[in-house]
Structures are given as C-alpha cells and as structure tokens.
Amino acid sequence: MSNGPLRVGIGGPVGAGKTTLTEQIARALAPRLSMAVITNDIYTREDAEALMRAQVLPSERIRGVETGGCPHTAIREDASINLAAIAELNAAFPDLDLVLIESGGDNLAATFSPELADLTIYVIDTAAGQDIPRKRGPGLARSDLLVVNKTDLAPHVGVDAALLEADARASRAGRPVVMAALRHGKGVAEVVDFLIEQGGLQPCPAHSHGQ
C-alpha cells in the first residue's frame, strides 16, 4: 500500500473480547501479510504482554502504550501517542500492510479519531445483558463492524441470542454485525473477510512474516 498500512481500531468495554479478537486476527493474517499491533492500557502493558505470550506475532511487532487516566483521549481527542507508535512501526517495518489499534477499556461513547483509524470494529459482550444494543452509543452504532462476542454464553446468562442479534442489527442502520464466540473461533473468518474486503488488503498465501 503506497499510503501506508491499513489502520484498524478495535474498541469496546472492558472484558468484551478486544484482545481475543486482536489475537485471532493476528493468528489468521500474520502468516499472510506484514502486520503489527498497538495496545492501549491505562497504566500497564498487560494486553501487549498477553499478545506476546500468545506468540501470534514477534514481540517487536507489538507496541503497548500507556494512556493514563482517560483511555478514550488517546484514540480520539489526542491520538499523538498512537500516531507516534504507528510511525515507529512503519520505520521498523516498511512493508507493513496492517496495524491493529486496540483501545483501552472504554464505554459505549468512545470512538476512534478518523486521523487514527481507517476502519473501526466495536466489540460487545453477550454476558453484559440483553439491553446493550439498545443503549446505542456511537461506537456501537457507527463503527464499521460490530462484533457481538460470547454468544455461546447466552443461555447461561438469560439472554435471548436471536433478540440480541435483532436489536444489534436494528441499532446499526444496515452496517454489518458478526455474532461471535471468539475464544472458540466462531465469527473470526467473517471479521477477517471484512478487513480484506473493506480494507483492500491483499494477503499472500500463507508464509511467515517473522521479521
């Protein structure tokens, strides 16, 4: 890509499955294109360390930024800390095709600055309750892709999965929704296909981009 890598923002509340989604995308695409990940944590680099332990990417392709008290500021009002991390990764890996930017745990109102992300994915958690899609925050309503995660838990938490999906789709004005159980791999292929199609990615047949 002549204009630099595709930048994909991944947002959603704490515990919804952002790091799991990041890991699964890396597992699917890292062997097929040059990619890197930036995680935003409030005071630690816990998410970056979790991705390193999962060994889905070499550690030098993972950057953890510490955002301080307001994680949404680092993805929206003042994205400089993330833009600097992207610039570092671009310098280190000039062939970079894709950068995933995982936001710190945020609420339904947090969104990514267009300056930072070309595409945005928002993750919500079935276990958070039946009414989550009706709360209609901008991340949920206006992200390019909504992932409703942990659908396998619906029967255990008293959630009607079909109604949850209907409400999620109703809140999206035609934008795509993926019903997923990311830990079990359900929904991952749809997310990857979305990134390839909407992001103009051209993954090679599987090979290693280790360095």
Swiss-Prot record:
One of its GO terms (biological process) is urea catabolic process. This is Urease accessory protein UreG. Pfam families: cobW. The gene is ureG. CDD domains: UreG. It is found in: Cytoplasm. Its main location: cytoplasm. One of its GO terms (molecular function) is GTPase activity. Homodimer. UreD, UreF and UreG form a complex that acts as a GTP-hydrolysis-dependent molecular chaperone, activating the urease apoprotein by helping to assemble the nickel containing metallocenter of UreC. The UreE protein probably delivers the nickel. It comes from Paracoccus denitrificans (strain Pd 1222).
